[in-house]
Structure formats: structure tokens, C-alpha cells
């Protein structure tokens, strides 16, 4: 069987200018920091990033924004990273703010191959602008379309050599659903174990949806 293991250097071969990339994490917790650093050092530009938030200037996906590598961000929160706001106001970067529940459901729909979903969230607000609305049973709903990416960068706690993943506490956040919603998914595990060492009922993400496992000195 072909191995899924690869180095960070190998992973940079997937990075291209203009890509749409989903990145796991919540204020940097559960973000694949070594993959983000490799993405920054690769020099790629004009990225569209889909993430829960833009974290801080030196945390999570923040350094990608600070260094001008991002053309567009789709996220639910940017308030802790002043550079995101500055670039949005100046017109240097496009920012699409999405309610958090809507964002994760868009990602889930992208992973499940669905055409979208109906939600009342945002009706009558700026969120509604440019979107199709439907009236069902006397209630107005927004049609939210699915989100997918060229590449997903996720982090897991433990990973076996087939790519089966477990997560730790709040570091789980968006990672399991992001893993499903991209053409290629790269995982950065805290710990790499042999196949068979993970308890089946502890596995959250099956190895079938993981394309490559990033190994480094930090992966025990």
C-alpha cells in the first residue's frame, strides 16, 4: 500500500498561487501551525482562506494576512486581528463575514456534496444581500450555498499510518468537517502511531478522507 506519510517540504508541492484553502482552528487552537508556516515560507500569494477566524497577528492564519499573502478571507470573526480589519478597510483584501453556524454548515454541505441549505439566520440584514430567499410555511429563509476548497490543512491529536484521526478537546473544532470539503486534505498530527493502536470508537475522521500525513520532528 502506498504510504500517506510526507515531510513538510513535500507538502509545499501542493501550494499554488490563487488557491482556495480551508484551515482548521479556533483562535489558533487546533490550527496546523507547521503547515501554515510552510505555506507562508513557500511564497505563494493571492490565496482565498476559509477559516473560523483570523486569530491574532502572530497566531493561526494571522501571519499569512500580515505578510500580504491573502486576497480573500471567508470567516466568522476577525476582531482579534487588527491587520485583517485594516486590510479590509483599505481594500487590500476582501473579507466575507459569515455567521459561525452558517459557515460550518456551508462547509459540511460542501463535504457532503449537497447543493446548499436553508436558514433564517441573516434574513433582513446585510447577510441577505445578493442571496436567494424562499418563503416556506410563511417564514423567509436564505439559501446558503456550499463551500469547498482546493486544499484543506487540518490538525489532529493522534493519527495512525492510514490517516485515521482523533482530536483533543477544543482543538477538534472545525477540523473534522474541513477534512471532508477539499480536493486534497493534509493533516498535521501531534502524535503518529501505528495502524491498530487507535481505539475504533475514538476515531473521528476516517483515513479514507485523508490524502497525506505530515511528519516532522515534532510528531512523536
Swiss-Prot record:
Keywords assigned by UniProt, alphabetized: Cytoplasm, Fatty acid metabolism, Lipid metabolism, Transferase
UniProt name for this protein: Acetate CoA-transferase subunit alpha
Q: Where is the signal peptide?
A: none
Per the entry, induction is: Transcriptionally regulated by the regulatory protein AtoC.
| UniProt source species | Escherichia coli (strain K12)
Q: What does this protein do?
A: Coenzyme A transferase which is involved in short-chain fatty acid degradation and catalyzes the activation of short-chain fatty acids to their respective CoA thiolesters. During acetoacetate degradation, catalyzes the transfer of CoA from acetyl-CoA to acetoacetate by a mechanism involving a covalent enzyme-CoA compound as a reaction intermediate. Utilizes a variety of short chain acyl-CoA and carboxylic acid substrates but exhibits maximal activity with normal and 3-keto substrates.
Q: Does the keyword Lipid metabolism apply?
A: yes
Q: Alphabetically, which GO biological process terms does the record hold?
A: short-chain fatty acid metabolic process
The activity regulation comment is: Inhibited by p-chloromercuribenzoate.
Highest taxon in the source lineage: Bacteria
The primary gene name is: atoD
Entry's EC annotation: 2.8.3.8
**Membrane spanning residue stretches:** none
Subunit: Heterotetramer composed of two alpha subunits (AtoD) and two beta subunits (AtoA).
